[in-house]
Amino acid sequence: MSITAEKKQELIKKFALHENDTGSPEVQIAVLTERIRNLTEHIKANKKDLHSRRGLIGMVNKRRKLLNYLKRESEERYRKIIEALNIRETSNESK
């Protein structure tokens, strides 16, 4: 369900803006996306796990807010991250 420390470090290294970057929107979005994908697989196998489903909804909302922020601040960085992570652009993100 959760991601390994190695996978998290790999994502941080790939999306970091500089060497010690762990908190930029790109890194946070990448880590959240990996957690969302893992939790989605868990929920597919455990349909009655409502507590995990609620956590998933919270993660998706947090990622959407970060994507909205990134789109407001830098359209280029926003486009790059959604293409790299293969995330759909929804109409809610433009509001």
Curated annotation (Swiss-Prot):
<keyword id="KW-0687">Ribonucleoprotein</keyword>
<protein>
    <recommendedName>
        <fullName>Small ribosomal subunit protein uS15</fullName>
    </recommendedName>
</protein>
<comment type="subunit">
    <text>Part of the 30S ribosomal subunit. Forms a bridge to the 50S subunit in the 70S ribosome, contacting the 23S rRNA.</text>
</comment>
<keyword id="KW-0699">rRNA-binding</keyword>
<dbReference type="InterPro" id="IPR009068">
    <property type="entry name" value="uS15_NS1_RNA-bd_sf"/>
</dbReference>
<comment type="function">
    <text>One of the primary rRNA binding proteins, it binds directly to 16S rRNA where it helps nucleate assembly of the platform of the 30S subunit by binding and bridging several RNA helices of the 16S rRNA.</text>
</comment>
<dbReference type="GO" id="GO:0019843">
    <property type="term" value="F:rRNA binding"/>
</dbReference>
<comment type="function">
    <text>Forms an intersubunit bridge (bridge B4) with the 23S rRNA of the 50S subunit in the ribosome.</text>
</comment>
<dbReference type="InterPro" id="IPR005290">
    <property type="entry name" value="Ribosomal_uS15_bac-type"/>
</dbReference>
<dbReference type="GO" id="GO:0022627">
    <property type="term" value="C:cytosolic small ribosomal subunit"/>
</dbReference>
<keyword id="KW-0689">Ribosomal protein</keyword>
<keyword id="KW-0694">RNA-binding</keyword>
<dbReference type="GO" id="GO:0006412">
    <property type="term" value="P:translation"/>
</dbReference>
<dbReference type="Pfam" id="PF00312">
    <property type="entry name" value="Ribosomal_S15"/>
</dbReference>
<comment type="similarity">
    <text>Belongs to the universal ribosomal protein uS15 family.</text>
</comment>
<dbReference type="GO" id="GO:0003735">
    <property type="term" value="F:structural constituent of ribosome"/>
</dbReference>
<dbReference type="InterPro" id="IPR000589">
    <property type="entry name" value="Ribosomal_uS15"/>
</dbReference>
